[in-house]
Amino acid sequence: VSLFIGCLVLAGILFSGCSSSKRHDRYVVVLSMDGFRSDYPDRAYTPTLDSLAKVGIRAAFRPSFPSVTFPNHYSMATGLHPDHHGLVNNFFYASDLDSIYRMADPTPGFYGGEPIWNTAEKQGVHAASFFWVGSEYPIQGRQPFIWKPFDKKVPYSDRADSVVAWLQLPEDIRPHLVMWYIEEPDAIGHICTPDSSATLEKVEELDRVLNHFRSEEHTS
């Protein structure tokens, strides 16, 4: 089953070419709903996503090859294709390292390139990660200022509330870049197929989570 990644950039930030005062007024939240096919909003009730599309940009999918979770998410973090950043699949053997990469037990030595949270931290901009691929281990000796080890049992609404809480932290520890990963509707799509009613129901649930996040963020 080929599933692609839906990614939302919910706010804007510039890391260079701006004064420190301007930089501290800007935020970006990158939310990936894994396996979110580009046609899902046309087939499910997604008023929040629809409203964002009207004021932003909606694009066709542009996956890296292979179009699976870990290579694509690390490509988004680094701006590199999988053959340049090292994660060429969710599970693979690397002869140069004589080691096997597994999603359930990833090895830090596989992660090449510079993820965007490292770029931010180098420039004095705190970053946070909620389950984003590559953030659980130091890369080039760095991690996001705030990060969470993956735990699929954490309710989606709690994840949204955590991101809002991060954006309310005191300025000296507040992240201005948040990378936020949700493992659905990929998981349900693999179990029930992407065209199933269960998958579309999950898409609608995620739209409600996004609406909850926007409501909490706007009132904070």
Question: Which residues does each predicted region cover?
Answer:
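A residue-level signal for conserved active-site and pocket-lining positions in enzyme catalytic cores
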Residues: 34, 76, 120, 180, ...
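Short, structured active-site-proximal loop/turn typified by the sulfatase FGly-forming signature C/S-X-P-X-R
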Residues: 39-84
